[in-house]
Protein backbone atom coordinates (compact mmCIF):
# COMPACT_ATOMS: atom_id res chain seq x y z
CA UNK A 1 0.00 0.00 0.00
CA UNK A 2 1.60 3.26 -1.05
CA UNK A 3 0.76 6.77 0.17
CA UNK A 4 -1.42 7.54 -2.85
CA UNK A 5 -3.51 4.40 -2.24
CA UNK A 6 -3.73 5.23 1.47
CA UNK A 7 -5.14 8.69 0.67
CA UNK A 8 -7.58 7.24 -1.85
CA UNK A 9 -8.90 4.86 0.82
CA UNK A 10 -8.97 7.56 3.53
CA UNK A 11 -11.08 9.88 1.41
CA UNK A 12 -13.33 7.19 -0.11
CA UNK A 13 -16.91 8.45 -0.48
CA UNK A 14 -18.42 5.30 -1.95
CA UNK A 15 -20.93 2.88 -0.46
CA UNK A 16 -20.46 -0.82 -1.17
CA UNK A 17 -22.76 -2.62 -3.58
CA UNK A 18 -24.89 -4.07 -2.10
CA UNK A 19 -25.22 -1.82 0.93
CA UNK A 20 -23.80 -3.49 4.01
CA UNK A 21 -25.51 -1.79 6.92
CA UNK A 22 -25.15 -3.72 10.18
CA UNK A 23 -28.26 -2.17 11.69
CA UNK A 24 -30.82 -2.09 8.86
CA UNK A 25 -31.60 -3.70 5.53
CA UNK A 26 -32.79 -1.58 2.60
CA UNK A 27 -32.07 -4.11 -0.13
CA UNK A 28 -35.75 -4.03 -1.14
CA UNK A 29 -35.11 -0.54 -2.52
CA UNK A 30 -33.08 -2.11 -5.32
CA UNK A 31 -35.67 -4.78 -6.04
CA UNK A 32 -38.47 -2.26 -6.62
CA UNK A 33 -39.31 -1.89 -10.31
CA UNK A 34 -39.83 1.79 -11.12
CA UNK A 35 -42.71 0.92 -13.48
CA UNK A 36 -44.58 -0.59 -10.50
CA UNK A 37 -44.27 2.68 -8.54
CA UNK A 38 -45.17 5.43 -11.03
CA UNK A 39 -45.46 8.20 -8.44
CA UNK A 40 -41.85 7.69 -7.34
CA UNK A 41 -40.29 6.17 -10.44
CA UNK A 42 -37.93 9.09 -11.15
CA UNK A 43 -36.41 9.26 -7.67
CA UNK A 44 -36.27 5.47 -7.56
CA UNK A 45 -34.41 5.38 -10.89
CA UNK A 46 -32.07 8.11 -9.65
CA UNK A 47 -31.12 6.08 -6.58
CA UNK A 48 -30.97 2.73 -8.35
CA UNK A 49 -28.70 4.04 -11.12
CA UNK A 50 -26.50 6.03 -8.71
CA UNK A 51 -22.84 4.97 -8.59
CA UNK A 52 -23.05 5.13 -4.74
CA UNK A 53 -20.44 7.87 -4.51
CA UNK A 54 -21.50 10.51 -1.98
CA UNK A 55 -20.05 13.50 -3.82
CA UNK A 56 -21.54 16.96 -3.43
CA UNK A 57 -22.37 17.21 -7.14
CA UNK A 58 -24.22 13.87 -7.34
CA UNK A 59 -27.97 13.82 -8.03
CA UNK A 60 -28.21 10.16 -6.99
CA UNK A 61 -26.53 10.96 -3.67
CA UNK A 62 -28.93 13.90 -3.24
CA UNK A 63 -31.95 11.65 -3.79
CA UNK A 64 -30.57 9.02 -1.44
CA UNK A 65 -29.74 11.59 1.27
CA UNK A 66 -33.28 12.96 1.28
CA UNK A 67 -34.70 9.42 1.36
CA UNK A 68 -32.30 8.45 4.16
CA UNK A 69 -33.50 11.41 6.23
CA UNK A 70 -37.12 10.29 5.73
CA UNK A 71 -36.40 6.69 6.76
CA UNK A 72 -35.48 7.74 10.29
CA UNK A 73 -39.07 7.97 11.49
CA UNK A 74 -39.84 4.45 10.26
CA UNK A 75 -36.74 2.80 11.68
CA UNK A 76 -37.88 2.53 15.32
CA UNK A 77 -41.22 1.08 14.25
CA UNK A 78 -39.58 -1.80 12.37
CA UNK A 79 -39.29 -5.12 14.18
CA UNK A 80 -35.85 -6.69 14.37
CA UNK A 81 -33.91 -7.37 12.17
CA UNK A 82 -34.96 -3.93 10.79
CA UNK A 83 -35.77 -4.85 7.20
CA UNK A 84 -37.40 -2.03 5.23
CA UNK A 85 -40.30 -3.34 3.15
CA UNK A 86 -41.20 -1.97 -0.26
CA UNK A 87 -44.36 -0.52 1.29
CA UNK A 88 -42.40 1.52 3.84
CA UNK A 89 -39.81 2.49 1.23
CA UNK A 90 -42.55 3.69 -1.12
CA UNK A 91 -44.00 5.92 1.64
CA UNK A 92 -40.56 7.33 2.39
CA UNK A 93 -39.86 7.93 -1.31
CA UNK A 94 -43.14 9.86 -1.61
CA UNK A 95 -42.12 11.97 1.41
CA UNK A 96 -38.67 12.54 -0.10
CA UNK A 97 -40.23 13.79 -3.35
CA UNK A 98 -42.62 16.06 -1.46
CA UNK A 99 -39.69 17.45 0.52
CA UNK A 100 -37.66 18.19 -2.62
CA UNK A 101 -40.62 19.85 -4.35
CA UNK A 102 -41.52 21.94 -1.29
CA UNK A 103 -38.03 23.20 -0.46
CA UNK A 104 -36.13 23.04 -3.75
CA UNK A 105 -38.88 23.35 -6.37
CA UNK A 106 -37.67 20.22 -8.15
CA UNK A 107 -37.46 16.47 -7.74
CA UNK A 108 -33.80 16.35 -8.70
CA UNK A 109 -31.21 17.84 -6.35
CA UNK A 110 -27.50 17.42 -5.81
CA UNK A 111 -26.24 16.25 -2.44
CA UNK A 112 -24.46 19.58 -1.98
CA UNK A 113 -27.74 21.47 -2.41
CA UNK A 114 -29.33 19.44 0.38
CA UNK A 115 -26.36 19.11 2.75
CA UNK A 116 -24.18 21.99 3.92
CA UNK A 117 -21.07 22.61 5.97
CA UNK A 118 -21.94 25.67 8.06
CA UNK A 119 -19.66 27.89 10.12
CA UNK A 120 -20.84 31.36 11.09
CA UNK A 121 -22.27 32.93 7.95
CA UNK A 122 -20.27 30.65 5.63
CA UNK A 123 -22.24 27.82 4.03
CA UNK A 124 -20.59 25.29 1.71
CA UNK A 125 -21.89 22.33 -0.25
CA UNK A 126 -20.42 19.18 1.26
CA UNK A 127 -19.81 15.57 0.29
CA UNK A 128 -20.37 12.50 2.46
CA UNK A 129 -23.17 10.53 4.07
CA UNK A 130 -23.29 8.31 7.14
CA UNK A 131 -21.69 4.87 6.89
CA UNK A 132 -18.96 5.52 4.34
CA UNK A 133 -15.28 5.82 5.20
CA UNK A 134 -15.35 9.62 4.90
CA UNK A 135 -18.60 9.70 6.83
CA UNK A 136 -20.71 12.79 7.47
CA UNK A 137 -23.64 12.92 9.88
CA UNK A 138 -26.15 15.73 9.55
CA UNK A 139 -29.04 17.40 11.35
CA UNK A 140 -31.93 19.56 10.15
CA UNK A 141 -30.75 23.04 9.18
CA UNK A 142 -33.00 25.52 7.38
CA UNK A 143 -35.21 25.68 4.30
CA UNK A 144 -35.30 21.89 4.00
CA UNK A 145 -31.52 21.49 4.08
CA UNK A 146 -29.34 19.58 6.50
CA UNK A 147 -26.03 20.67 8.01
CA UNK A 148 -23.11 18.44 8.85
CA UNK A 149 -22.65 17.96 12.59
CA UNK A 150 -20.22 15.04 12.68
CA UNK A 151 -17.71 13.24 10.53
CA UNK A 152 -14.53 14.40 8.89
CA UNK A 153 -12.90 17.03 11.09
CA UNK A 154 -9.23 17.42 11.96
CA UNK A 155 -7.18 15.26 9.64
CA UNK A 156 -3.42 14.89 9.80
CA UNK A 157 -1.51 12.62 7.48
CA UNK A 158 2.11 11.98 8.38
CA UNK A 159 4.61 10.37 6.04
CA UNK A 160 8.06 9.31 7.21
CA UNK A 161 10.56 9.47 4.37
CA UNK A 162 14.35 9.22 4.08
CA UNK A 163 14.35 13.03 3.74
CA UNK A 164 12.33 13.50 6.92
CA UNK A 165 8.73 13.87 7.99
CA UNK A 166 6.07 15.21 5.61
CA UNK A 167 2.79 16.37 7.13
CA UNK A 168 -0.52 17.27 5.54
CA UNK A 169 -3.30 18.58 7.77
CA UNK A 170 -6.66 20.24 7.58
CA UNK A 171 -9.37 21.17 10.02
CA UNK A 172 -12.94 21.88 9.01
CA UNK A 173 -13.90 25.50 9.44
CA UNK A 174 -10.77 27.07 10.96
CA UNK A 175 -8.37 26.95 13.86
CA UNK A 176 -10.28 29.33 16.15
CA UNK A 177 -13.59 29.07 18.00
CA UNK A 178 -13.86 32.85 18.23
CA UNK A 179 -16.28 34.19 15.59
CA UNK A 180 -14.36 37.48 15.24
CA UNK A 181 -11.05 35.74 14.53
CA UNK A 182 -9.85 35.69 10.92
CA UNK A 183 -9.20 31.96 11.47
CA UNK A 184 -12.82 31.17 12.46
CA UNK A 185 -13.77 29.82 9.03
CA UNK A 186 -10.71 30.18 6.83
CA UNK A 187 -10.06 26.52 5.99
Annotated model-derived regions:
Residues 7-187:
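Acidic, low-complexity N-terminal propeptides/linkers enriched in Ser/Thr/Asp/Gly that mediate export
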Amino acid sequence: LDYKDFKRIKFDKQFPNPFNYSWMNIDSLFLMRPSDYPSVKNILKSIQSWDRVASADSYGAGSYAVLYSKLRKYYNKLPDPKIFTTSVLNKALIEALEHMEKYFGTTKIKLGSFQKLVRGDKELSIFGLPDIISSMGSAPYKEGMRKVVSGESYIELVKFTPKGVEIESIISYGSSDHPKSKHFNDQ
